[in-house]
Amino acid sequence: MNADAKTEIKGRERYKAGVLKYAQMGYWNGDYEPKDTDLIALFRITPQDGVDPIEAAAAVAGESSTATWTVVWTDRLTACDQYRAKAYRVDPVPGTPGQYFCYVAYDLILFEEGSIANLTASIIGNVFSFKPLKAARLEDMRLPVAYVKTFKGPPTGIVVERERLDKFGKPLLGATTKPKLGLSGKNYGRVVYEGLKGGLDFMKDDENINSQPFMHWRDRYLYCMEAVNHASAVTGEVKGHYLNVTAGTMEEMYRRAEFAKELGSVIVMVDLIIGWTAIQSMSEWCRQNDMILHMHRAGHGTYTRQKNHGISFRVIAKWLRLAGVDHLHAGTAVGKLEGDPLTVQGYYNVCREMKNAVDLPRGLFFEQDWADLKKVLPVASGGIHAGQMHQLLDLFGDDVVLQFGGGTIGHPMGIQAGATANRVALEAMVLARNEGRDIAHEGPEILRAAAKWCKPLEAALDTWGNISFNYTPTDTSDFVPSVTAA
């Protein structure tokens, strides 16, 4: 692109031409210095052959703010210079020819307060199907404090949840009921009881268990809460079960949540696929009713997994913290689901830190101040077992829920034994860590020593000790070493 093609055309000349390049319409400004109140989006773009990357970046800025395909005279009726998003930086993606990181700044006035639906309608509403781009991915986003303060965030938060459960200094343990579909209400409740009695803190509905012919939702809630109450009485610990209230309408979701509350549940669950407005609505209900809100990220892989097109999960995690969830499935790194260890740690940092620093290896391109918004408790779930306890504790620390579904329900000695194996493995590993031992390297030895006194743990290690899912992650962090928010 020549210099003239990058220079904004102003005044009457602007409105004589029917079609101008986006850079000429003012959507590119290489000298722009983002304001503290600007929202900044980092896109990975793959322009079509022959499309200049600066023009492609300007097109992204234009189509995600005020532009259309031609000049419109009604621009003159607005403060268009303020309302236009501004692409201000383009960097080649290291080691990936034809792809570029482009930085786009948006004035805060473009967005409705406290609405993820409005934010996403602008940022991702149109540009991802734009013909001049082969592909586009939203890699990261800096949310200005003034905008963050318009959201209420998680209804409970990590600190209050731990106080309610009276459990501190170690990860929480959970399991997803298996098989996820097909059990009767009574058998489902028995699985819940066995897991909780064996030592777990939580049991969980899976993403697609709602109200099917084989088990009506009311039956499941009744049997599950009977199991929770019985296990709590037997163990003397506060227990819970994530009751999935996901349904076809908000009215039905509220109906189910109210019934869960009447039964004494401390937590309800929704799936990501219900949409942003529904998520924020359920978060507000939980805030008003002192309930913990668990978020299952069902469906996220359809747009987060591929590196060249879609949305990074770190951005989804940021939006969900704003929207207000207390728990969020954020990957395991060592389990069966996609996840590079450093990238997954970046997701956890988004959930748990009060201020994120720039951390390029973990995919965090911007500083992010969360303005006292409560923390989200990440959940590690999917293909993990007791033999990986040292890796999980070393990677993620204490503030995490470790959920062993198959690693509990599939134990050769039964469900309760599976839960006990996980509890003993965790307690042994936390004790070793607190004594100053190097659990990352001594973990297998520590587990085997504990297994001498715990037959369920011994059986778990014999069954799964060598099981791992060693695949090359598709989503790893690419970065330019000099990248900063400016």
UniProtKB/Swiss-Prot annotation:
Pfam families: RuBisCO_large, RuBisCO_large_N. Its cofactor is Mg(2+). InterPro entries: RuBisCO (IPR033966), RuBisCo_large_chain_AS (IPR020878), RuBisCO_lsu_C (IPR000685), RuBisCO_lsu_C_sf (IPR036376), RuBisCO_lsu_fd_N (IPR017443), RuBisCO_lsu_N_sf (IPR036422), RuBisCO_lsuI (IPR020888). Binds 1 Mg(2+) ion per subunit. The modification N6-carboxylysine is found at residue 204. Substrate binds at residues 126, 176, 180, 297, 329, 381. Keywords: Calvin cycle, Carbon dioxide fixation, Lyase, Magnesium, Metal-binding, Monooxygenase, Oxidoreductase, Plasmid. Mg(2+) binds at residues 204, 206-207. The basic functional RuBisCO is composed of a large chain homodimer in a 'head-to-tail' conformation. In form I RuBisCO this homodimer is arranged in a barrel-like tetramer with the small subunits forming a tetrameric 'cap' on each end of the 'barrel'. RuBisCO catalyzes two reactions: the carboxylation of D-ribulose 1,5-bisphosphate, the primary event in carbon dioxide fixation, as well as the oxidative fragmentation of the pentose substrate. Both reactions occur simultaneously and in competition at the same active site. NCBIfam families: PRK04208.1. Belongs to the RuBisCO large chain family. Type I subfamily. This is Ribulose bisphosphate carboxylase large chain.
